[in-house]
Amino acid sequence: MAEAQEKYQHQFQSQSPPFPTQEWVQFFPSPSPKSPAGTATTTTSSTKKDEKVKYMISTDPSLLSLSALDSAFTQEYMYWVKPLPAPVLKDMIDRSLCFGVYRCSHSNIANDNGNVGVEVDIDTDADPATARNMDATTNLTQIGFARLITDNVTFAYLTDVYILPEYQGTGLGSWLLQCVNAWVDGRGEYFRRFMMVTVGERAEGYYQRVMGVETQGRKGDVFIMGKKGKGAVV
């Protein structure tokens, strides 16, 4: 009996979270040539006015840039977070289902992503295994992120959603939430509930419209929102 329990415990501890990688690709208008601070930036020759830019959303954790997340976590637009030590940040990523948003560009194009966008360097910043899915002439610049805390069976909580300010207003934020929604709506018969928290009535209306969530409670300007899954009883 003891041997059986020990074997079961070992097998349980060795299992990694069952998060199959999903990817979405879409084209959006090129971002404004203005930086978040309003300082003019130089538009590259490859990004002309009204030109569509290729973006990718992926749940592959090996694509994520920890330095991009660390930079974003220090910005005022992520007012609900504080910077984390690198080992803690990595642990957070490893324990979550993360949606990275990336701008796709050729390697001979300079990064015009402002002061908080960080290119994913296959050799240093991201997992070298990433190279298996990337063209040799393609760079991915991480410009957004969302994170689900989930057991992958009954519950999911959405947090740390952002798109860099210079990329907002192009539809990328709504697309990111739609991709998260696709994952949530694709859960099985035992999935009970999706939850999130946001601040302000404007954000409340936005999430209601894009994700179909309902307000479950409110304290001041803080809204608790969510929606039932297929396995919800109450």
Language model regions located:
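Short amphipathic alpha-helix that is part of the acyltransferase structural core
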Residues: 4-84, 111-117, 124-125
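Short alpha-helical
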Residues: 64, 153, 201-202
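Amphipathic alpha-helical interface elements that mediate macromolecular binding in regulatory proteins
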Residues: 67, 71, 174-178, 205
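A conserved beta-strand-loop-helix scaffold within acyl/acetyltransferase catalytic domains
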Residues: 86-107, 114-117, 121, 127-165
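Eukaryotic short linear interaction motifs
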Residues: 108-109, 165-167, 204-205
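Conserved acetyl-CoA-binding loop-helix of GNAT-fold acetyltransferases
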Residues: 163, 169-184, 209
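Conserved active-site alpha-helix within GNAT-family acetyltransferase domains
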Residues: 185-230
